[in-house]
Amino acid sequence: EIKETFKYINTVVSCLVFVLGIIGNSTLLRIIYKNKCMRNGPNILIASLALGDLLHIIIDIPISVYKLLAEDWPFGVEMCKLVPFIQKASVGITVLSLCALSIDRYRAVASWSRIKGIGVPKWTAVEIVLIWVISVVLAVPEAIAFDMITMEYRGKDLRICLLHPTQKTSFMMFYKQAKDWWLFSFYFCLPLAITALFYTLMTCEMLRKKSGMQIALNDHLKQRREVAKTVFCLVLVFALCWLPLHLSRILKLTIYDQKDPNRCELLSFFLVMDYIGINMASLNSCINPIALYLVSKRFQNCFKSCLCCWCQSKDLLSLEERQSCLKFKANDHGYDNFRSSNKYSSS
């Protein structure tokens, strides 16, 4: 009964995520690609994050919806391995991009001079390549572990794609047993811990700045604080979306006992939590553009301009957006002049 109920709920949520995710993430990528003033380090990382979400939405969600509604798996063993592989790679891209964004915000405050110059795009490109390579490598065990089995159900032989109960190597058996703890520690706790660490360091660094420098760089600091607030919002959204799923899996590992006479009620509770967690985690693929629209004024202006004038020329940029870009560049130039005149003034 629980499975039958959530089958339709999950289908509706998946269709909603599919539509909103394609519109939101493709619009976000177009904004960063078309507008030169939006092509900075943090925004390129956000674009990488959006691209990872878009791949997951286009490939995984339609197949997952079919899997919910149909009993049999008709796509073959290749797709059985590809779907969980892309899903884990997409989550890995999200996690590592959020870590890189948090570190980037601290470095922006601690070392102003590294923001400008040709080194920034090169370092950002290296970061993105590393993020994608590491995410793909860490997702390989999923492709190995998942396989198809045939089982009898209601007088029919059904082909099912799942994490195979028996693995061929000792490493894969260990991965199967430790999978939930590994996912919880790396794909959930790591970005939260890194964000907490570097945002604490960033706060200490900003409090340590001299009051005169704070006044001179008032507009520049406002720009940095807005980006920091945006990154923090993305991490918070990630945590809220993925917490229910990880919580249900960890509780099942720690509380569930096969000898417990009430285990059926407990399993039903965990099944409900699992379905809710899957829906919440799925929302994370489409909610980042919405969060950026609500938190960042610059992204809000760009979204409005892009959605209203999707087919128009890239020259039709809103006046407020252009002023924002010019103001940001002027602040950078003003800070360089201030910094060069005070380079040797501190003891």
Curated annotation (Swiss-Prot):
Signal peptide: none annotated. Its main location: membrane. Residues 1-7, 70-81, 150-177, 257-268 are extracellular. InterPro entries: Endthln_rcpt, ETB_rcpt, GPCR_endothelin_rcpt, GPCR_Rhodpsn, GPCR_Rhodpsn_7TM. Disulfide bonds join 80-161. Gene3D superfamilies: Rhodopsin 7-helix transmembrane proteins. Residues 33-43, 104-124, 203-230, 296-347 are cytoplasmic. The keyword Disulfide bond applies. Non-specific receptor for endothelin 1, 2, and 3. Mediates its action by association with G proteins that activate a phosphatidylinositol-calcium second messenger system. This is Endothelin receptor type B. It comes from Coturnix japonica. The gene is EDNRB.
